[in-house]
Amino acid sequence: GNKEVSDIKILNLLSDCEEKLNIKAGVELCQNALINSPIMIGFFRPSIILPAKELGSKELSYIFAHELIHYKRRDMFYKWLIEIAACVHWFNPFVYLLGKEVNRTCELSCDEAVVLILGDKTKREYGDMLISFVRADNQYKSSLASVTLTEGAEQLKERLGAIMELKKKSKSIKV
């Protein structure tokens, strides 16, 4: 099960990231030994769930920025809508294609925002972190109703290409 994070350094990193992104409501932070990649779950009470492995402060900053951008953009709401549509229209393959496209778009957009917020110099480290999470095999497979940092090799390849091609557009960004 999930174990609440009590490490003050990690909680301060999360708080700093929430402040940087102007997020008022706190997001719960937990760890789970059964996952190898961070994930955000919950719609009314969102939680970021970290793998139980040791993560450095840079990695945690990237993870928190990524997951909090999903939270701020309400990506969970859109994923839940797709999940509900899939329940009602379970026989329609286009609903599943739409779900994959929504997930892909959310991740690419989120990666872009992370790099723009954290700076151009973080592209390589952020990409390396994504690769490390894809290499780890999760016991829990993600669903459309969750937001994860990684999905698979093909999507990772597309995400890394987009991250590396990203040019600094302007100093102001609306998240």
Regions found by a protein language model. Name each.
Residues G1-V175:
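Membrane-embedded and juxtamembrane structural elements of multi-pass membrane proteins
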